[in-house]
Amino acid sequence: MGVKITGLDKMQKQLKEVERATEALNGSYDVRFDANDPSSIENAIQEAYSMVDERASGYATNPMVSPLIEHMKENLRQQILDSAEQQRQESGQDGD
C-alpha cells in the first residue's frame, strides 16, 4: 500500500523563495540621522523599513518569508537606536 504525499512542490517553491528573499535582504542599509533628534531617528527607521519592504516585495506573501521580514525590521530598528545612543554618548564625552 502506497502513500501519496502532496504539497511538496508548494513547499519547495516556498523554500526557494526564502532563499531568494534572504539574499535580497542581505547587504547594507545606509540611513542617515541626527542622533539628537528623535524625529530624525524615527525617519531613519521608517526609511530602513521601506528598504526591507522593497527588497522583499516579491516574497512578502510567502508565509515563511514574512517572519524574516519582521525580524529584519526589528534588527535594523535596534541597530539604529543603538547607533544613536552611542553617538549621543560619544558627543557627550567630547564635551567633558
From Swiss-Prot:
Keywords carried by this UniProt record: Plasmid
Domain of life: Bacteria
Protein's name in the database: Uncharacterized protein YuaX
Protein source organism: Escherichia coli (strain K12)
Gene symbol of the encoding locus: yuaX
